[in-house]
């Protein structure tokens, strides 16, 4: 390469650098000018926006000030109106006080005038009394002088004469008053009883000793009986109820005098029929479950009864005992219905006489509570009822009402008399009771009572309408020979103490169970 060529290359390079510099400078100046213009435009826009915001803020401030001014003026007007009203009320009160003061002044003037008049009259009366006393003394002296009798002697003569004349009239008036009082008392008593009876509408209850369980088909009867009768025998043994399986289509009859046992057997048999699995172990399970259900139902009946009658605050155990009356009858009359009826009647009569109706209802509801206890507890239902009421701290009037409603004790309150009257009314109404059914049930209860009075007896059941009594004994207390002796002793005692038609079969059952579990 020649020096000329190198020189030319250097010159061209320098020329290119100079041209590039001027081009970049021109471009940079153009960009700076554009940026300056944009900045000026942005600044101008910002100024315009700031001015607009300023104007808008001023307008809003003016509106706010105007609104506040209007609200303040409105509040001032309201306060002025309220002050004006208060001022008017104060003026009205001042006027009323002025009028009252004027009235008080007038009354004070009238009272002063009357007081002055009364003082004058009092003075005049005292003067007249003095004159009358003086005249009486003068007349007495004159009479004593004329009759030659002293004042006391004359007074005694007059009193004796008046006493003789009035004694006969007093006796007649006393007799007439007594007769009128008796007539009025009888009339009022009849009126109170009629009102109470009209206001208390009760059902005529007639309890039976059988229950019917419907079956889905007649094939179920064979399953209930079981192989060699083991199912029906287990159910009868556990419940003490007779199962009558006859030609009645799709039905089994449960017969027994104890309604609680009968209801337990009915529920258990219903569950077994619905479940379909009928065997001794399942029967025992269902009977136990049914007993718990009956216990729950008894408690619910007690609570429902206290709610319907309006008696509150009873002890929970007493409520459960009250519910047992649902399954008790007296001469065919349901005892719970009878107790409710007595409570209503006693409460109505107490209201008519102005006595405590709530306490009368309480006493009426609990008057037969002793009938809920089984015959295992000795004593009459009155004695048991008094013991229960005392145990659960009932009111003394309630305890006396229970003790006196059959005349065993003297009633100490009107409520006790009303409870006895209500008890008689409820029992005496037509159709309320049946003597035959009650005697039959008592005979069955006596059968069980005699059987369970012997040592070693676990439980007993009177079945077959009282023609058989089955006695379950404890196998560890009585052996086979003693079981025969026990049957003879019970048979002899039944013959000595009971009157009954036909024959009574005494069956003593001694059962030993051995249970093991394979693991």
Curated annotation (Swiss-Prot):
This entry's Gene Ontology molecular function terms read:
RNA binding; RNA endonuclease activity
Q: Where is the HD domain?
A: 335-428
* GO CC annotations on file: plasma membrane
**Alphabetical UniProt keywords:** Cell membrane, Endonuclease, Hydrolase, Membrane, Nuclease, RNA-binding, Transmembrane, Transmembrane helix
SMART domains found in the cross-reference section: HDc, KH
Where is the protein localized? Cell membrane
Q: Which InterPro entries match?
A: HD/PDEase_dom, HD_domain, HDIG_dom, KH_dom, KH_dom_type_1, KH_dom_type_1_sf, Ribonuclease_Y, RNase_Y_N
The principal location of this protein is: membrane
On the tree of life, the source organism's domain of life is Bacteria
Write out the similarity annotation: Belongs to the RNase Y family.
What is the designated name of this protein? Ribonuclease Y
Q: Which organism is it from?
A: Bacillus velezensis (strain DSM 23117 / BGSC 10A6 / LMG 26770 / FZB42)
């Amino acid at each position: 390469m020649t020096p000329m060529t190198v020189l030319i290359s250097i010159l061209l390079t320098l020329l290119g650098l100079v041209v590039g510099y001027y081009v970049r400078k021109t471009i940079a100046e153009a960009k700076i000018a554009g940026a300056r213009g944009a900045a000026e435009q942005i600044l101008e826009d910002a100024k315009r926006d700031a001015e607009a915001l300023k104007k808008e803020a001023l307008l809003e401030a003016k509106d706010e000030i105007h609104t506040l001014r209007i609200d303040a003026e409105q509040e001032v007007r309201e306060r002025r109106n309220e002050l004006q009203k208060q001022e008017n009320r104060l003026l009205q009160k001042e006027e009323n006080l002025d009028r009252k003061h004027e009235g008080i002044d007038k009354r004070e003037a009238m009272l002063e005038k009357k007081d002055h008049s009364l003082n004058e009259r009092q003075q005049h009366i005292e003067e007249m009394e003095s004159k009358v006393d003086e005249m009486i003394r003068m007349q007495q002296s004159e009479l004593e002088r004329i009759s030659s009798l002293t004042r006391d002697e004359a007074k005694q003569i007059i009193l004796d004469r008046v006493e003789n004349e009035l004694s006969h009239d007093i006796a007649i008036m006393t007799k007439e008053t007594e007769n009128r009082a008796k007539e009025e008392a009888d009339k009022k008593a009849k009126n109170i009883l009629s009102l109470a009876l009209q206001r208390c509408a009760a059902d005529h209850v007639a309890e039976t000793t059988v229950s019917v369980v419907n079956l889905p088909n007649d094939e179920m009867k064979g399953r209930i009986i079981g192989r060699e009768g083991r199912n029906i025998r287990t159910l009868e043994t556990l419940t003490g109820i007779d199962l009558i399986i006859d030609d009645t289509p799709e039905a089994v009859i449960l017969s027994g005098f104890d309604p609680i046992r009968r209801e337990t057997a009915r529920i258990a048999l219903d569950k077994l029929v619905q479940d379909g699995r009928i065997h001794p172990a399942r029967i025992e399970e269902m009977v136990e479950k049914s007993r718990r259900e009956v216990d729950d139902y008894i408690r619910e009946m007690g609570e429902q009864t206290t709610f319907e009658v309006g008696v509150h605050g009873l002890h929970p155990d007493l409520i459960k005992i009250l519910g047992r009356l649902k399954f008790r009858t007296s001469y065919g009359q349901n005892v719970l219905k009878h107790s409710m009826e007595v409570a209503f009647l006693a409460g109505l009569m107490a209201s008519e006489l102005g006595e405590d109706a709530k306490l009368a209802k309480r006493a009426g509801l609990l008057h037969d509570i002793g009938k809920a206890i089984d015959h295992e507890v000795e004593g009459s239902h009155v004695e048991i009822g008094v013991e229960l009421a005392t145990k659960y701290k009932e009111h003394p009037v309630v305890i006396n009402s229970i003790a006196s409603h059959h005349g065993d004790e003297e009633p100490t309150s009107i409520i006790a008399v009303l409870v006895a009257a209500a008890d008689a009314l409820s029992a005496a109404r037509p159709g309320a009771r049946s003597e035959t059914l009650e005697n039959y049930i008592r005979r069955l209860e006596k059968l069980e009572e005699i059987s369970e009075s012997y040592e070693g007896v676990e439980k007993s059941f009177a079945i077959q309408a009282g023609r058989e009594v089955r006695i379950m004994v404890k196998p560890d207390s009585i052996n086979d020979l003693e079981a025969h002796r026990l049957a003879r002793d019970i048979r002899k005692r039944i013959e000595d103490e009971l009157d009954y038609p036909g024959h009574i079969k005494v069956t003593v059952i001694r059962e030993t169970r051995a249970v093991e579990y394979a693991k």
